[in-house]
Design a protein with these regions (language model features):
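Bacterial N-terminal signal peptides that target proteins for export
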Residues: 1-10
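Bacterial N-terminal signal peptides
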Residues: 9-20
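Auxiliary tRNA-acceptor-end handling modules of aminoacyl-tRNA synthetases
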Residues: 25-317, 335, 342, 350-443, ...
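Soluble non-cytosolic domains of exported or imported proteins
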Residues: 100, 315, 319-327, 359, ...
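Solvent-exposed, polar/charged alpha-helical surfaces in well-ordered, non-transmembrane soluble domains
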Residues: 323-330, 334, 450, 454, ...
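Sec-exported extracytoplasmic/periplasmic mature domains
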Residues: 330-341, 461-462, 466, 491, ...
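The catalytic-center signature of Zn2+-dependent metalloproteases
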Residues: 349-371, 450-504
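Conserved catalytic/binding loops enriched for acidic/polar residues
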Residues: 472-473, 480-852
Length: 852
């Protein structure tokens, strides 16, 4: 997934534009007679020759920037400008990671007498007309931005000018302070006394100039409010990071733009053209991709590139993870070969020891540590004049692997009393002789490395221009086949010998079928006289004939989304069938769960943390199955492309899905066995609850009823989503054979009704879930986002339920809640959900800020 301004998200890409400058200016080039020449002014300084030469005054602690080759109007060339964080905060909540890079902008310097301005033209609005008056009308219609101002310190006629850029490079270019304020962490201010130019990473090269600064953000006790900085900074009153700023030469001509197609699987780079004919679309969209040109334009297969696409893996990752990152990212060469390129066209190596990962010349795969587990993402700097990717920047969170290891421990309960592993990596479905916990014999590590390879390929795919494809896993395939690395994969688990979960096929290897289709669309170079438009349409048409789906984020992430096959962290052609397959696997793993899930010497209370991913093992498959209810099967249709038109999910499939989903609300599913509860003591000193812990109503002790409520709420949040409820009303009106909202509510109550109450834990769980169902229906009835008919039907069902509740002494509180709503619906406040521990990486999901 891309982060901040830089993330390619699931999802808007910040772009870099370069078009002619804006307003006409009257700016004399002549320097005042009292200005020294650049060579005279910088004679005692340390020089950094390059694109924009730097001069360091060690005595004054100032950094001077030389701006060469101003034109007759006093304007410089255009440059690509970016900023980033070589040293981050380590806080997933703050979202300020090591290696983060902004999206980049086009800027130029403009001299006005003794002053120089750094100007960012407004390049989102353009004119393709050849008439200068038309172009000027567009430029004058929208504002530009002046990012900084400088005083001319020296000038050399016909050579350039010198400015003091110290304050510019010591500013908070990346917006760290703004982020802290936005997240209500307190009033942090940039402290110049505790900030300095970092000369160790300040460099100038022929095509780029790089400057790094040490910046300290300070606050006092009174203004501190949040805890995120406290979690990661040794002194929360002074948080010091590094910010990096880059100026880069724009790429040369020779790159051919390629039109965006919503079926292609690529991200678009967009701008508005105000000169297109009336009736034509003003929005101009091109896919984003790297420059890749054949040595021989007439070559058709195994073609050599003028310059291969080269990526580098951060050496900061330890083995065996480092090699797994390399191997996974290299899978993409398979897709390029399938698109007609020679082996080695896409290359991945370890980063040279003397290379700076912040340097815009390097495509980088970085390994980042955080306080809590969070999203990985693929970012890119893009020039939308052509859609060319200038730099790919992958950020991989190191705690992802540890979470996967925890999932494997929970599924396997793999340790004997001496800490030896009971199952071999190559045959973890059956017992084996005990072995030491080593990388060669750990089935947990084997699964983690499988996932790390896939993750490296996934995030690298974003930096090649590819969006997510959440429909890929619905295509029929074997567990060993990769449909797309651009999916969010759930580990494929089976039950092996003696009822032991088998993880040997958790994640497949190699690039996916869809990935080859997408790379073929984006990177195949056609013969010079070929009809590219027709050839690209054929690539998509051939894929459509196979029935392979491409459905991305906006149709997959929301709980109220409608597509029956586009989901996150799911498997299987039929979501309900896959949920029914997983439920007994979860039950088998829970039956074996106990002390063997943690190593000897570990506090038993830590079993609570290990239990979380196992107890909630089916959460995303249940969500996927729920989306079949009031589901709509559709494609990204273009007129005349022959793809199937939207179709409501068949009634029998909706009812099958409902039956499967309601199993996750049953007491058999939700009630933990006594064998587990008796080995879950309260948490020990130093092992406090975190957001990764189950909620509790019981204080220090583990609360199995709250755990059940939190799991039930995951199902109910999707099932009674207001958009889904509104579609149930609409689709039933269009086809009376499909389930109605009333039917879904009735079936849900039937599943959680306690027909034979008894004094045991299952009864208490069932009562708690029954109460949660009522709360979710009250919330639906009061939700203005639901249609009026959906709210009315829900209200009627609650009224019909009330007599049953009044006849049961244990349900009087629920009846009172219904009365509270009916007496004053406008002022009714729904109860908060019982929040389950996060399943996805912690932090913003792809809400438009990022691509993970």
């Amino acid at each position: 997934m891309l982060k901040m301004a830089m993330r390619l998200t699931s999802v808007t890409v910040l772009t870099l534009l370069a078009v002619p400058t804006f307003a006409q200016r009257e700016t004399p080039r002549e320097s005042p007679k009292d200005l020294p020449t650049i060579s005279a002014r910088t004679a005692a300084m340390t020089h950094y020759p390059g694109l924009l030469p730097l001069h360091w005054d060690a005595v004054a602690g100032k950094l001077y920037l030389e701006i060469p080759h101003l034109d007759a109007s006093g304007q410089s060339a255009d440059y690509l400008y970016t900023h980033g964080l070589p040293y981050g905060t380590g806080s997933n909540d703050l979202g300020l990671d090591r290696g983060q890079v902004s999206g980049g902008i086009i800027v130029h310097f403009q001299r006005f007498g003794p002053k120089v301005l750094l100007v960012q033209p407004n390049l989102a609005f353009r004119s393709s007309a050849k008439d200068p008056a038309e172009q000027l009308a567009v430029r004058q219609s929208f504002p530009e931005s002046v990012l900084a101002g400088f005083k001319v310190e020296a000038a050399t006629p016909d050579a350039g000018i010198l400015v003091d850029a110290t304050d510019f490079f010591l500013r908070d270019a990346h917006g760290v302070g703004e982020t802290l304020t936005h997240l209500q962490q307190g009033s942090y201010r940039l402290d110049p006394a505790r900030s300095a130019i970092a000369l160790d990473h300040t460099k100038a090269f022929p095509k780029n100039t790089e400057v790094e600064a040490i910046l300290t953000f300070a606050t006092d006790v009174a203004s501190r409010r949040g805890s995120f900085v406290d979690d990661v900074s040794p002194d929360p009153h002074a948080m010091t990071v590094r910010e990096h700023q880059s100026f880069m030469e724009l790429p040369p001509p020779g790159f051919t733009p390629r039109r965006f197609d919503p079926r292609s699987g690529f991200f678009p780079s967009s701008y508005r053209d105000y000169s297109v004919p009336l009736g034509d679309d003003m929005a101009q969209q091109f896919i984003i991709r790297h420059r890749l040109i054949k040595k021989d334009p007439n070559c058709t297969t195994s073609c050599e590139a003028v310059a291969p696409i080269q990526y580098y893996v951060d050496r900061g990752a330890a083995e065996p993870v480092r090699t797994a990152l390399l191997e996974g990212a290299r899978w993409w060469d398979q897709a390029f070969q399938a698109a007609g390129w020679a082996p080695g066209t896409f290359k991945v190596d370890f980063l040279p020891a003397d290379a700076d990962p912040m340097d815009l010349r390097y495509n980088i795969i970085q390994w980042v540590h955080r306080y809590t587990r969070g999203w990985s993402y693929g970012a890119a700097v893009v020039d939308p004049r052509t859609g060319e990717i200038i730099k790919g920047n992958v950020t991989l969170g190191s705690l992802r692997g540890r979470q996967d290891y925890l999932i494997a421990e929970a599924l396997l309960s793999p340790y004997d009393a001496k800490g030896m592993i009971l199952y071999e990596a190559e045959n973890i479905s059956g017992p084996a002789e005990s072995a030491s916990v080593t990388k060669n014999e750990s089935p947990m590590l084997k699964m983690v490395l499988q996932r790390i390879r896939q993750l490296a390929a996934h995030e690298t795919g974003h930096t090649l221009g590819l969006a997510h494809n959440y429909g890929a896993s619905a295509f029929p395939h074997s567990p060993d086949e990769t449909m797309s690395v651009m999916e969010y994969p759930h580990p494929y688990v089976t039950l092996g010998k003696d009822g032991i979960p088998d993880l040997s096929h958790a994640y497949p290897v190699n690039i996916g079928i869809w990935d080859k289709v997408a790379i073929n669309y984006g990177y195949r170079q056609f013969a010079p006289k070929a009809d590219e438009h027709a050839a690209l349409n054929k690539i998509i048409a051939d894929n459509e004939k196979t029935g392979f789906l491409y459905i991305t984020d906006e149709d997959s992430r929301p709980l109220g989304s409608a597509h029956p096959h586009a989901h996150l962290w799911d498997n299987g052609e039929d979501p309900a069938d896959e949920l029914n397959r997983l439920i007994p696997i979860r039950a088998a793993a829970l039956a074996r769960f106990g002390e063997n899930a943690i190593k000897p010497g570990t506090p038993l209370a830590q079993l609570q943390d290990t239990l979380v991913p196992l107890y909630l093992f089916t959460r995303y498959q249940a969500e996927a199955a729920t989306k079949e209810i009031a589901g709509l099967d559709y494609r990204y249709n273009l007129r005349g492309d022959g793809q199937p038109l939207p179709e409501i999910v068949a009634p029998e499939l909706q009812r099958k899905a409902l039956a499967a989903v309601l199993k996750t609300l049953s007491p058999d599913f939700l009630t933990l066995p006594e064998s587990i509860l008796k080995v879950l003591p309260p948490r020990t000193p130093g092992l406090e609850r975190t957001r990764e812990s189950f909620p509790t109503h019981t204080g220090l002790t583990f609360d199995p009823i709250a755990a059940a409520e939190s799991s039930a709420d995951l199902t109910l949040a999707t099932l009674f989503n207001p958009q889904r409820a509104s579609r149930l009303v609409e689709y039933h009106a269009r086809n009376p054979q499909v389930p109605s909202l009333s039917e879904v509510i009735q079936q849900t109550f039937a599943a959680v009704r306690d027909e034979h109450p008894s004094a045991n834990l299952q009864h208490e769980v069932k009562m708690a879930v029954h109460a949660r169902v009522i709360e979710w229906l009250l919330a639906l009835a009061a939700n203005p986002q639901a249609s009026s008919e959906a709210r009315a039907i829900t209200r009627d069902r609650l009224i019909a339920l009330k007599p049953t509740l009044l006849g049961n002494p244990t349900s009087l509180a629920e009846a009172a809640r219904i009365d509270e709503f009916l007496s004053n619906p406008d002022k009714f406040v729904p109860a908060k959900p019982i929040e389950a521990p996060p399943g996805m990486p912690i932090g913003d999901d792809e809400d438009g800020n990022a691509i993970y």
